[in-house]
């Protein structure tokens, strides 16, 4: 049994039986874990209103196998006030993490980035795109996705802000005259290295890059949060 309280957030919930749920959590010291929340679907369960997304939680669990049982859960603070765009963006972040993080692998630095991301989504709804791009880059780094944005992978020369570069998976960025979805301008690559998305063109390029880079981790199944976002606000995800 986990004796000390563990900080965590709900990433995803799914029905397990008539009265229970399987809940994916992102925890500070244990990474992504799936816990059985017994009886939580019953009307009088004290945990029913606690196990909600975007609520900072304190957790305890027990068990020796792969599937452990949640024993205690308390809100560490109030649920973050997500509104419309921020809400769907938060669901997107949660779904990405639920898919890409290895079970029982600690990502303490990414947990802090996640907390910062959620706080900023709730407090800065007009800055959603740069907030998401920053977190996507931080997630790629936590996964060990190493790419050099500052040097040509073929020659080792510093990236020229005015030149175009072709992204090749497992290699990096190579100077090229080709123009396609894998082409990026040098100035944007240098901005990626600093996670500086203050310019609109760089922000759009960053979104294109993270979609390419995250695809091998996410798999072929479409993101449900993105489909929901598109159905409610179809113009927001174009491009």
Curated annotation (Swiss-Prot):
One Pfam family it belongs to: RecO_N
Transmembrane segments annotated in the record for this chain: none
Single biological process term from Gene Ontology: double-strand break repair
Keyword DNA repair: yes
Record GO cellular component, one term: bacterial nucleoid
Key words, A-Z: DNA damage, DNA recombination, DNA repair
Keyword Transport on entry: no
Protein family membership: Belongs to the RecO family.
Annotated NCBIfam families: reco (TIGR00613)
Function: Involved in DNA repair and RecF pathway recombination.
Protein name, entry field: DNA repair protein RecO
Taxonomic lineage from the root: Bacteria, Pseudomonadati, Pseudomonadota, Gammaproteobacteria, Pasteurellales
């Amino acid at each position: 049994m986990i004796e000390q309280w563990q900080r965590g957030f709900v990433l995803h919930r799914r029905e397990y039986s008539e009265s229970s749920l399987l809940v994916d959590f992102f925890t500070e010291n244990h990474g992504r874990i799936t816990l059985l929340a017994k009886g939580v679907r019953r009307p009088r369960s004290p945990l029913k209103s606690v196990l909600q997304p975007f609520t900072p939680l304190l957790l305890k669990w027990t068990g020796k196998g792969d599937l452990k049982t949640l024993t205690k859960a308390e809100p560490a603070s109030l649920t973050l006030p997500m509104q419309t765009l921020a809400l769907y963006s938060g669901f997107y972040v949660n779904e990405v993490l639920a898919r890409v993080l290895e079970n029982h692998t600690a990502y303490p630095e990414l947990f802090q980035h996640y907390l910062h991301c959620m706080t900023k989504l709730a407090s800065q709804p007009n800055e959603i795109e740069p907030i998401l791009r920053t977190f996507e880059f931080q997630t790629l780094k936590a996964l060990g996705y190493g790419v050099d944005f500052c040097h040509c992978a073929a020659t080792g020369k510093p990236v020229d802000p005015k030149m175009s570069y072709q992204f090749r998976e497992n290699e990096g960025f190579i100077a090229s005259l080709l123009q396609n979805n894998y082409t990026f301008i040098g100035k944007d690559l240098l901005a990626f290295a600093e996670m500086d998305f203050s310019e609109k063109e760089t922000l759009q390029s960053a979104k294109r890059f993270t979609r390419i880079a995250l695809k091998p981790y996410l798999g072929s199944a479409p993101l449900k949060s993105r489909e929901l976002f598109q159905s409610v606000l179809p113009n927001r995800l174009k491009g």
